[in-house]
């Protein structure tokens, strides 16, 4: 069975689920200690180490409203000391418990760290007329959802790059936040992070408290730039955001393509991705490269559309 994809250039490479998850856990948690990696793998919930045909039912513990259309959902793993073990830039597939319609299956990115014990968390936006997101927003504590995976979109390796630039919009922050958490929780990973995050108003900024804590705790390595296209009167002063969209000039001055050994990850609505990195391809294909990043001198090999 095929359950995981990992990037090889702009084309996906299919890996058997056991190899993919084991490799992903090793990549993320590599701290020079084989025993530490083995200990983590041994605690990883076995439901996230099986084939794609293996679906596991997890009960909802709680949910928290983050904005008018977005919630953080916390699901319980079977045992209190279980961990997800899911590597950065990976996601799970979810479907309503007891149903098998392919149209009801959706990918969701965990925002909890791989070593978080007992639970796994997701930030999910309610899409109008979206079957799965509507189902998620109808859940009550102790209701269950079926999950399978993980699917690895990009195989992250610690210290492969001196720095990464993250361009996100709206709920596209979730895989970028996942990557930030993975880097910053790994004492061996010294990668610097430059995040450009665009929204309409301050109320739409997801995980702002957590992002600001990253910047405060790792001020020498993390720089965050907020942009609001339709700010309210107090938004700019309260958030320190800039009015408008992520400016080409800001990327050029704060994250120039001339920086050696750097990489860019882009995630957001289709028009956002197209404007900055070119049209995204179907499924796991990267599609054409273009947009503002190409104009700034970045090459296709330096940019990944999450």
From Swiss-Prot:
EC class of this enzyme?
oxidoreductase
CDD domains found in the cross-reference section: cyt_b5_reduct_like
Locate the transmembrane regions by residue number: 12-32
Enzyme Commission code(s) on record = 1.6.2.2
* GO CC, one annotated term: mitochondrial outer membrane
Instruction: Please name the InterPro entries in this protein's record.
Output: CBR-like, Cbr1-like_FAD-bd_dom, FAD-bd_FR_type, Flavoprot_Pyr_Nucl_cyt_Rdtase, FNR_nucleotide-bd, OxRdtase_FAD/NAD-bd, Riboflavin_synthase-like_b-brl
Question: What does the record give as the function of this protein?
Answer: May mediate the reduction of outer membrane cytochrome b5.
Name of the protein this chain belongs to: NADH-cytochrome b5 reductase 2-B
- The organism of origin for this protein: Vanderwaltozyma polyspora (strain ATCC 22028 / DSM 70294 / BCRC 21397 / CBS 2163 / NBRC 10782 / NRRL Y-8283 / UCD 57-17) (Kluyveromyces polysporus)
């Amino acid at each position: 069975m095929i359950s995981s994809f990992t990037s090889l250039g702009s084309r996906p490479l299919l890996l058997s689920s056991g190899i993919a998850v084991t490799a992903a856990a090793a990549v993320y948690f590599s701290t020079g200690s084989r025993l530490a990696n083995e200990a983590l793998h041994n605690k990883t919930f076995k439901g996230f180490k099986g084939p794609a045909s293996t679906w596991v039912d997890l009960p909802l513990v709680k949910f928290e409203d983050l904005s008018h259309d977005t919630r953080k959902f916390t699901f319980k793993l079977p045992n209190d000391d279980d961990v997800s073990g899911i590597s950065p830039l990976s996601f799970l597939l979810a479907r309503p418990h007891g149903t098998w319609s392919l149209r009801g299956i959706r990918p969701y990115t965990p925002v909890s760290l791989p070593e978080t014990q007992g639970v796994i968390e997701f930030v999910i936006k309610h899409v109008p007329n979206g079957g799965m997101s509507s189902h998620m927003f109808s859940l009550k504590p102790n209701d269950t959802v079926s999950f399978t995976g993980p699917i690895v979109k990009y195989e992250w390796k610690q210290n492969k790059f001196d720095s990464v630039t993250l361009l996100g919009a709206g709920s596209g922050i979730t895989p970028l936040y996942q990557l930030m958490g993975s880097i910053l929780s790994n004492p061996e990973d010294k990668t610097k992070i430059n995040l450009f995050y665009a929204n309409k108003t301050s109320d739409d900024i997801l995980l702002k408290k957590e992002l600001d804590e990253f910047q405060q705790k790792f001020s020498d390595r993390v720089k965050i730039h907020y942009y609001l296209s339709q700010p309210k009167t107090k938004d700019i002063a309260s958030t320190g955001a800039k009015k408008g969209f992520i400016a080409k000039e800001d990327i050029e001055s704060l994250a120039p393509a001339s920086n050696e050994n750097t990489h860019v990850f882009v995630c957001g609505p289709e028009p956002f991705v197209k404007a900055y990195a070119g049209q995204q391809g179907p499924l796991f294909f990267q599609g054409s490269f273009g947009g503002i990043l190409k104009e700034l001198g970045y090459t296709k090999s330096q940019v990944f559309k999450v």
